[in-house]
Amino acid sequence: MNNKSLIFLAIKSLDIQNQISLTSNIFNLSFDIQLNQIIIDSQIKSDKDLKSILLKVLNSIGNQSLDSNDLANNYKRRFRYYFSKMSFFRSLEKSIYENNILIDNLGITGLYLLYLIVEKEDVFKLWLYYKNYTFDQLIRLIETKNNFYN
C-alpha cells in the first residue's frame, strides 16, 4: 500500500459531510481526480476546516475508552470497509485480512499523515503536495512530531 492510497482511504473514512456520498465507480478514476472530487464534494474551504475535523477524530482515537467512542469507532469501521474495497486487498495474506488491529493502525497512520500535510501546507491541496515533496520528506516531518506516539 502506498502513501497516496493510505491518505486517500483516510480522507474517505473521515466521512466528511455525512460525509461524502461517493459511489464505488470513483475507484476507477485516477488518484488526483478522485482527491479533487472529494475536496469539491466535501466543501472544505480551508485547511482550518479539515484540521479541526482531523483533530477531533485523532483525539477520539487517542482516548482510552475507545469502546464507547462513536467517532473513533465509526472512523475505524469506515476505514476497514474502504480498505477491503481496494483492489490490492485481494492479494493480501489471510493473516492481514483478519487483523483488525493492523488495519486500524494503518487507518490512524493515514489520518496522521493527512494531518501533517495539512499542517505543513497551509492550504488543503494535497495534489500539489505530491508534486512538490517526496515521501522521505514527509517521513522526516513525522519523525519531528514523534509526540503523537507517546
From Swiss-Prot:
It is found in: Plastid, Chloroplast. Keywords: Chloroplast, Plastid. One of its GO terms (cellular component) is chloroplast. It comes from the Eukaryota. This is Uncharacterized protein ORF148. It comes from Pyropia yezoensis (Susabi-nori).
